Design a protein with these regions (language model features):
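Structural signature of nuclease core domains in nucleic-acid processing machines
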Residues: 1-83
Length: 83
């Protein structure tokens, strides 16, 4: 996991090819209750943007950078994608 932007995302998956490649950034959060899961996802997406995790990959030339937030509470999981 390499550092990007102003910190380090939890998980980054990227293709070897840059010009035709893609990057997926995942930020993970633990929620205290099922009711808090959506807010945890929103915090994770805000962190991705605030810390500029995608910028190094865009600068490197990756045409597609997708950003996802995942929140967990016990055995439940919620996923939100950045627009």
């Amino acid at each position: 996991n390499r550092e990007s932007g102003n910190g380090r995302p939890d998980i980054v998956m990227q293709t070897v090819q840059v010009r035709k490649g893609r990057v997926i950034i995942l930020e993970l959060k633990i929620a205290g209750s099922i009711a808090e899961m959506e807010a945890a996802c929103d915090r994770a997406l805000a962190q991705i943007e605030a810390q500029h995790y995608a910028e190094p990959f865009i600068t490197e030339g990756y045409p597609e950078v997708k950003k996802y937030a995942l929140s967990f509470c016990k055995k439940e999981c919620m996923v939100k994608k950045a627009e």
